[in-house]
Structure formats: structure tokens, C-alpha cells
């Protein structure tokens, strides 16, 4: 479980200090949290399907997911205030490292024709966002128990000062990026 955290402390931290010439140990980039979210859209109309999505995300994350509700009514989207619009879970500490380890070593290699994650997902502040098309790549998910397949957004929030540091941190952890750039 803590394989990734040990790897970070033993080999990644010193590599980051050496590459970016970091003097203050508090400025060494570290992953703060991982947020997994699903915008339910049409799925939100059926309470049973929405609960199934929440259960699936909870199973994948290893932590209970919360159903997010609309803050405002938007007539164009046919959404009222308080209407369920998605599911999300925020992972920190041990759960975060366990999820990242599972994502990198088990789930992503199971994706058909996977060539790596795009490098365009960095936001300029050292955070990385990417989407997955379906949840079936995770070993916990049983195909028979899914009412409808759905994708998910994954945000990796780091303390990196810029995208270059964040990208190097994620590369050293083992996130498979596409070749180039």
C-alpha cells in the first residue's frame, strides 16, 4: 500500500532537490490531494443510477463519495437548486497514495490502445487534470453490477510552484505521459 510513499521519500524527493536546486525542504513538491469527480448530467435524473455511480466511485477510491448538488438553478440546463448534479471524492494521505499506485500500476495499463496521458492537463499552478472514459479498467468494478458506464475526471493537486516541477514529480512517481514535448 505505501509503496508509492516510500518511493517518494527515498528516491523522488532527492531527485527533485537535485534537479531544481531546492534549498528549503518545505518547497519540495509533494502531492497534496487527488479529487475524483463525475458530472452526472443525464444520470442525475434517475436516483438509482446516481447512487450506483456513487457506489462505484466509492469502491474505486476506497472512501465514501458524496453526491454534489447544484448551488443555483439554471433553466438552460433544466437544473434546480439542490438538484443532484454529480459525485465526487477527495483523497488525501494513505488513500491518495493507494489510489495513485492502483491507477498507475493496474488501471491505466488495462486501457486498450493506451499511449499515455496528455501533457496538456497542467493548469499553470502545478496541478494536473485528466479524464477517463469509463470505470471498467479498475479491478474492483464488476461489469454485471454497473447500470451505466460513465467517465470520471481526476485532478492531482500538488504543492509544485509551476508545471515543470509538477510534471517532473508525476513522471518520477510513474504517471505515463505521451512521448514528446
Curated annotation (Swiss-Prot):
GO cellular component: a single term: ribonucleoprotein complex
Which PROSITE patterns does the protein's record reference? RIBOSOMAL_L5
Alphabetical keyword list: Ribonucleoprotein, Ribosomal protein, RNA-binding, rRNA-binding, tRNA-binding
Recorded GO MF terms:
rRNA binding; structural constituent of ribosome; tRNA binding
According to its UniProt entry, the protein's GO biological process terms are:
translation
Pfam families with a match to the protein in the record: Ribosomal_L5, Ribosomal_L5_C
Tell me the protein family, please. Belongs to the universal ribosomal protein uL5 family.
Q: What does this protein do?
A: This is one of the proteins that bind and probably mediate the attachment of the 5S RNA into the large ribosomal subunit, where it forms part of the central protuberance. In the 70S ribosome it contacts protein S13 of the 30S subunit (bridge B1b), connecting the 2 subunits; this bridge is implicated in subunit movement. Contacts the P site tRNA; the 5S rRNA and some of its associated proteins might help stabilize positioning of ribosome-bound tRNAs.
What quaternary arrangement does the UniProt entry report? Part of the 50S ribosomal subunit; part of the 5S rRNA/L5/L18/L25 subcomplex. Contacts the 5S rRNA and the P site tRNA. Forms a bridge to the 30S subunit in the 70S ribosome.
* Protein name from the UniProt record: Large ribosomal subunit protein uL5
The organism is Campylobacter jejuni subsp. jejuni serotype O:2 (strain ATCC 700819 / NCTC 11168)
Taxonomy of origin reads: Bacteria, Pseudomonadati, Campylobacterota, Epsilonproteobacteria, Campylobacterales
Amino acid at each position: 500500500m505505501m509503496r508509492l510513499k516510500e518511493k517518494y521519500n527515498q528516491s523522488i524527493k532527492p531527485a527533485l532537490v537535485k534537479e531544481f536546486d531546492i534549498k528549503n525542504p518545505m518547497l519540495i513538491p509533494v502531492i497534496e490531494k487527488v479529487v475524483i469527480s463525475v458530472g452526472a448530467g443525464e444520470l442525475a435524473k434517475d436516483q438509482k443510477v446516481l447512487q450506483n455511480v456513487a457506489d462505484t466511485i466509492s469502491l474505486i477510491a476506497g472512501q465514501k463519495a458524496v453526491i454534489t448538488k447544484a448551488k443555483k438553478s439554471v433553466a438552460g440546463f433544466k437544473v434546480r437548486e439542490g438538484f443532484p448534479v454529480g459525485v465526487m471524492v477527495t483523497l488525501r494521505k494513505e488513500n491518495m497514495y493507494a489510489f495513485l499506485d492502483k491507477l498507475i500500476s493496474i488501471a491505466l495499463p488495462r486501457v486498450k490502445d493506451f499511449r499515455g496521458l496528455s501533457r496538456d492537463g497542467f493548469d499553470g499552478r502545478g496541478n494536473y487534470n485528466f479524464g477517463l472514459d469509463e470505470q471498467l479498467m479498475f479491478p474492483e468494478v464488476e461489469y454485471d453490477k454497473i447500470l451505466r458506464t460513465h467517465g470520471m475526471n481526476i485532478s492531482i493537486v500538488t504543492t509544485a510552484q509551476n508545471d515543470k516541477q509538477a510534471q517532473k514529480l508525476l513522471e518520477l512517481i510513474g504517471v505515463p505521459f505521451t512521448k514528446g514535448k
